[in-house]
């Protein structure tokens, strides 16, 4: 398993990963949102390669002294394999080495918040139908143990 920075040539594989998680974890309209993000809003974004295939992806965005865990997903056939946890930990470690970040945030849905909760994030807010009808936004902050 290799974690490396995203490259433009990864686009179709990353979009296929997202598609494998629609509609269980992401709303169909988020497909276009991800394309926009990767084209115009990307800051630090990483992919996980296994056997020459991208099996997970996730990013970090920054705003003032906050770091946002963004656009996380793992191939739907590999959920529970530990790859998502490894990618999350990789990004948390990168954020911590910068020193300027005071708070690590994730905005997720009611379908994925349990993953973040198990990995040290605490719910601070919830907004109904934020991402799309039936997809609430759960605002969580990392609390290091």
Task: List where the protein language model places each region.
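Conserved acetyl-CoA-binding loop-helix of GNAT-fold acetyltransferases
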Residues: 74, 80-93
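Conserved beta-strand in the GNAT
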Residues: 47, 53-61, 66-73
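Active-site rim helix/loop that mediates acceptor-substrate recognition in acyltransferases
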Residues: 24-47
């Amino acid at each position: 398993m290799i974690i490396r920075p995203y490259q433009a040539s990864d686009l179709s594989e990353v979009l296929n990963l997202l598609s494998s998680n629609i509609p269980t974890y992401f709303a169909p309209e988020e497909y276009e949102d991800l394309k926009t993000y990767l084209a115009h809003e990307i800051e630090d974004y990483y992919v996980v390669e296994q056997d020459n295939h991208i099996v997970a992806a996730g990013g970090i965005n920054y705003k003032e002294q906050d770091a946002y865990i963004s656009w996380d997903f793992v191939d739907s056939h590999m959920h529970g394999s530990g790859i998502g946890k490894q990618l999350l930990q990789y990004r948390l470690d990168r954020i911590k080495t910068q020193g300027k970040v005071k708070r690590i945030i994730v905005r997720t849905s009611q379908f994925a918040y349990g993953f973040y909760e198990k990995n040290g994030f605490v719910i601070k807010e919830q907004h109904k139908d934020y991402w799309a009808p039936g997809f609430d936004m759960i605002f969580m902050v990392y609390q290091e143990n």
